[in-house]
Amino acid sequence: MANTTSAKKATRKIARRTDVNKARRSRVRTFVRQVEEAIASGDAAKAKEAFLAAQPELARAASKGVLHANTASRKVSRLAARVKALSVTTTA
């Protein structure tokens, strides 16, 4: 239990930040899931559209400190590879 005024304020700030970060993390997961569902359905156009929407969300989460920059980069890279593979198989 926080005793000093500054510790009490810090506790309040942490609680607010936690709520904001949870919302950001949830938003990122939603966008990534939409890309994965589009890939699973086999629709290359829908997958590309969903990927283009997810990419800035991942970058934003990394810049805000919700995700590590390397984690966001890795997720973008792997999603891009899967979307590209899907578009190659549908056109070939």
From Swiss-Prot:
GO cellular component terms, semicolon-separated: cytosol; small ribosomal subunit
Task: Fetch the InterPro entries from UniProt.
Answer: Ribosomal_bS20, Ribosomal_bS20_sf
Molecular function (Gene Ontology), one example: small ribosomal subunit rRNA binding
Q: Where is this region: Disordered?
A: 1-23
Q: Which UniProt keywords apply?
A: Ribonucleoprotein, Ribosomal protein, RNA-binding, rRNA-binding
Q: What does this protein do?
A: Binds directly to 16S ribosomal RNA.
| Protein family according to the UniProt entry | Belongs to the bacterial ribosomal protein bS20 family.
NCBIfam families, per database record? S20
Record-given protein name: Small ribosomal subunit protein bS20
The organism named in the record is Rhizobium leguminosarum bv. trifolii (strain WSM2304)
Q: Tell me the gene name.
A: rpsT
